[in-house]
Amino acid sequence: MTTPSGSERYIVDSSGWVEFLGDGPKAAGFEPFFEDPASLVLPTIVVYEVFKKLLLERGISFAEQFYARACELRDSTIVLDTDLAVRAARVSVETGLPMADAIIYATAQELGAKLVTSDAHFAGLSGVTLL
């Protein structure tokens, strides 16, 4: 299992945020990646996915708690621009990843960040830690 290193950057994908915030069965595996906010990178597509899921399943108050935490990472938030969109489209064609997953993976690749997830779509891809 990969553990965070002070010199590396990490993207915890939507599945990891939901597990961690909801104290799911894999929350403990994701917890170390949230301990150093300076090492976290947060793609805006992750904000969308997590906020929506929490809003639907846990309500507005819980979703807004996540949003407040996401705002604390504003300096590490990566916005989808045209270059990243094209890179993600290429990744999707090459790997078969769905759109949101391709954006997340392309963001990690672009930044040289490790992607930490429990989503089986990412299994076998370079730079991915599957919990």
Regions found by a protein language model. Name each.
Residues 51-52, 89:
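Amphipathic alpha-helical segments within well-ordered protein domains
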Residues 71-93:
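Acidic catalytic patch
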Residues 17-18, 47, 122-123:
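A generic structural signal for short hydrophobic patches within well-formed alpha-helices
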Residues 1-42, 55-68:
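Short, well-structured N-terminal submotif of metal-dependent ribonuclease cores
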Residues 12-13, 42-44, 96-98, 119:
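Histidine- and aromatic-rich ligand-binding microenvironments
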Residues 1-7, 105-131:
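Acidic, PIN/NYN-like endoribonuclease modules and their adjacent C-terminal/linker elements
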Residues 14, 82, 101-102:
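Conserved glycosyltransferase catalytic-site signature
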